[in-house]
Design a protein with these regions (language model features):
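Extreme N-terminal cap/leader segments of soluble proteins
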Residues: 1-68, 87, 96, 114, ...
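A glycine-rich phosphate/pyrophosphate-binding beta-strand-loop-alpha-helix module
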Residues: 68-122
């Protein structure tokens, strides 16, 4: 059980969710929630690896100014690609989830996607 008076870290949360979800039916051969990625077999010789890391302003990065959005776009994809690589996978697709500040300029958003695209091409 989680204590409301205590700061909960990433790995404590993962273990907590694993305990809650352990009664869920997991497809044969699948590896559920963990630190890097979940594994879902797709036939005899292939699997899907799924991951999603969220970056929080003030924790994982300082709020960007100007070109900093490009670097943040790069980092947002790179942290997820590294999870796929850690599992021995090769990335083919990405899902982007954004929580944006009210005052984000259109050029900031463009720079974010340019950084993300540059990382994807690498």
């Amino acid at each position: 059980m989680l204590s409301p008076s205590k700061t909960v870290g990433e790995f404590t949360l993962i273990r907590h969710f694993q305990n809650i979800l352990k009664s869920q039916a997991i497809p044969r051969g699948a590896i559920g929630i963990g630190d890097d990625a979940s594994v879902y077999p797709q036939g005899k010789h292939a699997s899907w690896l799924m991951t999603h890391d969220m970056l929080l302003a003030g924790i994982h990065f300082l709020p960007p100014q100007g070109r900093g959005w490009w670097e943040l776009g790069w980092k947002a994809l790179a942290v997820n690609l590294s999870d796929i690589a850690a599992m021995g996978g090769r990335p083919s697709q990405a899902l982007v989830g954004l929580g944006l500040p009210d005052k984000l300029s259109p050029s900031g958003l463009q720079n974010f996607y340019r950084g993300l695209k540059a990382c994807a091409k690498k």
